[in-house]
Amino acid sequence: MAKVLVLYYSAYGHIEKMAYAVAEGAESAGAEVSVKRVPELVSEEVAKASHYKIDQPAPVATVEELGDYDAIIFGAGTRYGTVASQLRNFIDQTGSLWAKGKLVGKVGSAFTSSATQHGGQESTILGLIPTMLHHGMVVVGLPYAFQGQMGIDEIKGGSPYGASTITGGDGSRQPSEIELDAARFQGAHVARIAAKLAD
């Protein structure tokens, strides 16, 4: 059984919802799944003033534990075409894991969100891939086997690089069912590959 970590940062709850959908998919494929978040970098005062969703039940991860998993699925919103600094800051602390090769051969994957359809979803996930490769991880995306990517009948996130959701400029749009299905598919896809590699 593969051990999968869904590691996320979510300011307003969109990525949190996607993270639990990813976890649901991984569990459906037989994985043992942990959902954890990275630490917030802004003060509680600023978070409250900005209406961040601060009541997230997922525990905060530690860098040291990342090597305990067969797969890590990273999730964070897009900030000006790149990953939110909270996740980037956490990842930038993994030098000791890199030095010991703790993530070599593990599966890495990512999902994201943006305010608009062309708000940097692909560039955000693509920006995470070099980090995974530097760690020696096996990168897995969201293949077109997930047919939900193919239609143009509704606004939706998702690409071969990973699942995503579009929040709207004011954050009022929540992940749609097809976006959550994409997240579930990606979680299951990662879990199956991780199980094969862990054998």
Curated annotation (Swiss-Prot):
Cofactor note: Binds 1 FMN per monomer.
EC number of this enzyme: 1.6.5.2
Coiled-coil ranges per UniProt: none
Catalytic activity: a quinone + NADH + H(+) = a quinol + NAD(+); a quinone + NADPH + H(+) = a quinol + NADP(+)
GO cellular component: membrane
Cofactor: FMN
Binding positions (FMN): 10-15, 78-80, 113-119, 134
Residues that, per the record, bind NAD(+): 12
A GO MF term: NADH:ubiquinone reductase (non-electrogenic) activity
InterPro entries: Flavodoxin/NO_synth (IPR008254), Flavoprotein-like_sf (IPR029039), Flavoprotein_WrbA-like (IPR010089), FMN_Rdtase-like_dom (IPR005025), NQO (IPR037513)
Limits of the Flavodoxin-like domain: 4-190
UniProt keywords, alphabetically: Flavoprotein, FMN, NAD, NADP, Nucleotide-binding, Oxidoreductase
Presence of keyword Oxidoreductase: yes
Keyword Nucleotide-binding recorded: yes
NCBIfam families: flav_wrbA (TIGR01755), PRK03767.1 (NF002999)
Protein family membership: Belongs to the WrbA family.
Family matches, as HAMAP family: NQOR
Protein name: NAD(P)H dehydrogenase (quinone)
Organism of derivation: Sinorhizobium fredii (strain NBRC 101917 / NGR234)
